[in-house]
């Protein structure tokens, strides 16, 4: 059991593994990003534990973000994954690969392209609340 949180990655020519092998099931990496820090989230799985425990994540948690929402989102997903949030820059299609999760064995795998590396040093409260949810998640054996 346990939780593995994998933060953003990008495809490169020196990768040892294909980008489809970053998780227990296949997904592709893209260079997709959402750069408008005010982009409104759409919650795709409102009842998912990662959006509710220990903190109920709402639109308010995405206020005050700096520079961008995220980058290197997932593209094609194996059906085992649940995409949790979608965003889009103005005039663009929504991207739902910024935060995905799946149960695997007795644990949970999470991939996120959310720009925590910018939000946490900037002291954005909602980023801390969401990250706390990611690292404190539990699964049922």
Predicted regions, residues:
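Short, solvent-exposed loop/turn segments at secondary-structure junctions
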Residues: 11-13, 89-90, 107-109, 115-118
């Amino acid at each position: 059991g346990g939780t593995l949180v994998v933060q953003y990655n990008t495809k490169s020519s020196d990768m040892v593994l294909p980008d489809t092998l970053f998780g227990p099931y296949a997904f592709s990496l893209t260079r997709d990003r959402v750069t408008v820090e005010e982009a409104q989230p759409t919650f795709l799985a409102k009842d998912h534990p990662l959006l509710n425990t220990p903190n109920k994540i709402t639109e308010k948690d995405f206020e005050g973000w700096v520079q961008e929402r995220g980058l290197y989102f997932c593209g094609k997903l194996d059906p085992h994954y649940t995409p949790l949030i979608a965003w889009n820059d103005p005039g663009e299609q929504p991207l739902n690969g910024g935060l995905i999760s799946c149960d695997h064995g007795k644990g949970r795998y999470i991939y996120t392209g959310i720009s925590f590396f910018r939000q946490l040093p900037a002291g954005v409260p909602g980023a801390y609340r969401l990250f706390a949810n990611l690292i404190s998640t539990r699964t049922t054996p």
